[in-house]
Amino acid sequence: VTDGAGREFRLVLTTQAQRAEEARTSSLSSSDSSRPLSASAFPDTLPGTEYGPDRGIRLSAVWLMHDPAYPESLPAAPLVRYTYTEAGELLAVYDRSNTQVRAFTYDAQHPGRMVAHRYAGRPEMRYRYDDTGRVVEQLNPAGLSYRYLYEQDRITVTDSLNRREVLHTEGGAGLKRVVKKELADGSVTRSGYDAAGRLTAQTDAAGRRTEYGLNVVSGDITDITTPDGRETKFYYNDGNQLTAVVYPDGLESRREYDEPGRLVSETSRSGETVRYRYDDAHSELPATTTDATGSTRQMTWSRYGQLLAFTDCSGYQTRYEYDRFGQMTAVHREEGISLYRHYDNRGRLTSVKDAQGRETRYEYNAAGDLTAVITPDGNRSETQYDAWGKAVSTTQGGLTRSMEYDAAGRVISLTNENGSHSDFSYDALDRLVQQGGFDGRTQRYHYDLTGKLTQSEDEGLITLWHYDASDRITHRTVNGDPAEQWQYDEHGWLTTLSHTSEGHRVSVHYGYDDKGRLTGERQTVENPETGELLWHHETGHAYNEQGLANRVTPDSLPPVEWLTYGSGYLA
């Protein structure tokens, strides 16, 4: 196989007879085998399946045979290797270091039915099936296990914390879809589909409906209408590429493409345009980008799509080097500043060295988790993990911080370097409901049906949070007294943020231009009972033709302007 970059790969295919012969030969030379492997134990042919005859041909290895960029530096081992059981089932996967990274176990009575699998350094996941071949239990020795109950048009999933989720389905012949979901806390969400099985509506646990308009031919989403009636529209070209998005506030973003379908310009909601140029008709990656200020950045790419050089708008260039496996090995910046990266035979970063020879080294466990970082001055920080790769302790400078998790992988206890503890509790939907702090304080949290925070308790303080139909926060109270208030205009932009302080209403009012950019801030202090204005201060914001902020005008003071170069760097 030759890829688009000119690399040639050899796919090594083996037959069942070849694998059987190899297994018998291996058993004869093995010191652990008291007798040779029989033909019945590893047959030369495989039985047929319900899909037809099985010729027993399997992919056993992939070799890199030619690399135009590294013609004299080809790997001496396959990039990946596969082994199989006597029934032709995938048994193990080995990476380019010949390390086994995946392992599989099968049901001897049901060929092809996987009953267990594991990743390198991780516990084994096991599966049980019913008589029809459906998974009824997934067993996780170091985390959540699941049980599955199948009924007519519904599936019940129960985890090892006894949380239950029910999936209600409709349709058939490849169009079965989940139309209703009962969550572990008893809340219910619903989904609607068209005749082709494409999602057209979702109703959340509060009964609010979001609708999706679809192109009947392509299936592209043409509009999304949220429960508050706000609509976002999407437009496409004949190649089904997104060309424009019109947002609920009326602002629009646009994208343009050339004939081969490459992105050539992108215009943001605020009107700034970035343009992309390509070296030739066959280039897939841009050679330059030019932003709204006219500043140009240049990129040079390898034949494999790797960034070789990046030149910013000031002419500052950064160069990159890679090894034959595509891993970055060096970064060269201006003024001789370089970093060199080294990897082990599994592709894991083992060291980073600068031009002065200062080196940071990295160590890993069998699962690939980063276990130690040794800095150039010899300081060593270590991290220990549980069976599933979650950090359980970190040690740095002789101080250790440790974490404990529940079966769902949620942090339930954190012990800091001073030995102080913080504990965490969660609801059935994994939301934090209580936290015991290092200082002994207890904080509690309550949520609505859609997951928004509605009440927080901090010792004697009870804060209530309120939202509008668009899920925007509108106000909050503390122990029944009004606190902050948020107000929005018809575009959904924040116009006022206010609170009461020492008996006065303190507010900040925001103004915008037609592109949604902030043009003014007005701070006021009022008598909340009479509305009398006691104090105010205004600040204006202005932008140049390229859309960059270039002037701030404080109240009753001369404007403050600044000069920029390139894409807005302060001169």
Label for each model-derived stretch:
Residues 1-571:
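Extended charged/polar low-complexity repeat regions
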